């Protein structure tokens, strides 16, 4: 498990999240969306599968088929959920 900062432009907020770095990116996005919606007491419009997770450091869009470990994202990593 690692702790990362996830910035979500829709809410203009950054969230600290504990993530299993071996979990697939698609599942990570789904879990993040669920947690953020609960924290904000709202529902995200659109389809969760259309969200993208990006690594701020490398300026990469992360492939849903891979995992955070594949991108060498570690504790303190900064991600962007759009």
Where do the PLM segments sit?
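Ubiquitin system architectures
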Residues: 1-82
């Amino acid at each position: 498990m690692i702790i990362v900062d996830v910035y979500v432009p829709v809410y203009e907020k950054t969230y600290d999240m504990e993530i299993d770095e071996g979990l697939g990116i698609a599942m990570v996005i789904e879990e993040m969306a669920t947690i953020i919606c609960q924290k904000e007491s709202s529902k995200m419009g659109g389809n969760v599968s259309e969200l993208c997770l990006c690594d701020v450091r490398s300026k990469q869009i992360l492939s849903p088929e891979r995992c955070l470990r594949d991108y060498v994202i570690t504790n303190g990593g900064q991600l962007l959920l759009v």
